């Protein structure tokens, strides 16, 4: 579950809410929205992705004029770097309070969190410290995932996996950063540069899946790839992805595709085993 729509609905910058003594607005609105979804799917887990507004998006909120103007907000002050910054930490703490309220006051312990756009292991460790100070301590009933969308996470996949309970591969941002391609560039898109099926991107995804499983954590993927390309979805199944998000209109088709791939894998394994016995 993404939280950006909650921020858009409130329409006010979190730090401006704090400065005007209205921090409870974010806590209450966010906790109410999360509670509605968490109750509907209980006891299945609801993984809430903490805010991932970029500076240009925050500037569009009331009180957002405090945001710096960045030339490239996509790789700017967002995600984990924002949470641990003295200029925004108190805003992140409001989000933590909302999560704690959902879990404590409503008993919805199926609510977990996911940290977007993390870049370093020390950043993750610091975010976890802040969360723990707000009563959100990582344990068997409260899991912390990260979005794996920055190449640094790929290069240190096992180290990151040792800090969290799950990876969610953000294939859109990962493709941009691995390939050095702006996905909004019509020229490069038309030339075929933005493609999650590129061998470099697939190698990065493979590394993340295998590192996650080596450390005993789950690995999922979100992005357009599995919905658009059946061969890409098949690749993910072969590599052992635990789950994938797809567009609503492709859910039934993708389920059949995954079932078919898994059946072929089982039959292939059985034939191989029978051949060894002979």
Labelled PLM ranges:
Residues 1-278:
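Conserved alpha/beta-domain cores
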């Amino acid at each position: 579950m993404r939280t950006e729509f909650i921020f858009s609905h409130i329409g006010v910058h979190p730090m401006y809410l704090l400065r005007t003594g209205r921090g409870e607005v974010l806590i209450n609105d966010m906790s109410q929205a999360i509670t509605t979804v968490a109750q509907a799917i209980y006891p299945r887990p609801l993984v809430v992705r903490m805010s991932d507004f970029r500076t240009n998006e925050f500037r569009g909120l009331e009180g957002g004029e405090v945001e710096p103007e960045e030339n490239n907000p996509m790789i700017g002050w967002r995600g984990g770097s924002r949470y641990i910054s003295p200029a925004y930490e108190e805003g992140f703490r409001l989000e933590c309070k909302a999560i704690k309220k959902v879990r404590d006051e409503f008993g919805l312990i199926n609510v977990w969190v996911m940290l977007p756009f993390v870049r370093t292991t020390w950043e993750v460790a610091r975010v976890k410290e802040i969360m723990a100070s707000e009563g959100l301590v990582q344990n068997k009933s409260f899991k912390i995932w990260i979005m794996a969308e920055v190449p640094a996470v790929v290069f240190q996949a096992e180290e990151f996996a040792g800090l969290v309970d799950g990876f969610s591969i953000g294939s859109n941002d990962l493709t941009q950063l691995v390939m050095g391609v702006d996905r909004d560039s019509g020229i490069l898109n038309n030339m075929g540069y933005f493609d999650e099926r590129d061998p470099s991107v697939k190698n990065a995804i493979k590394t993340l899946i295998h590192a996650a499983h080596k450390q005993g954590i789950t690995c999922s993927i979100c992005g357009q790839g599995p919905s658009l390309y059946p061969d890409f979805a098949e690749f993910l199944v072969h590599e052992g992805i635990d789950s994938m998000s797809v567009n609503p209109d492709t859910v039934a088709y993708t389920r059949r595709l995954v079932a078919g791939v898994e059946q072929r894998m089982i039959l292939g394994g059985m034939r191989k085993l029978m051949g060894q016995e002979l």
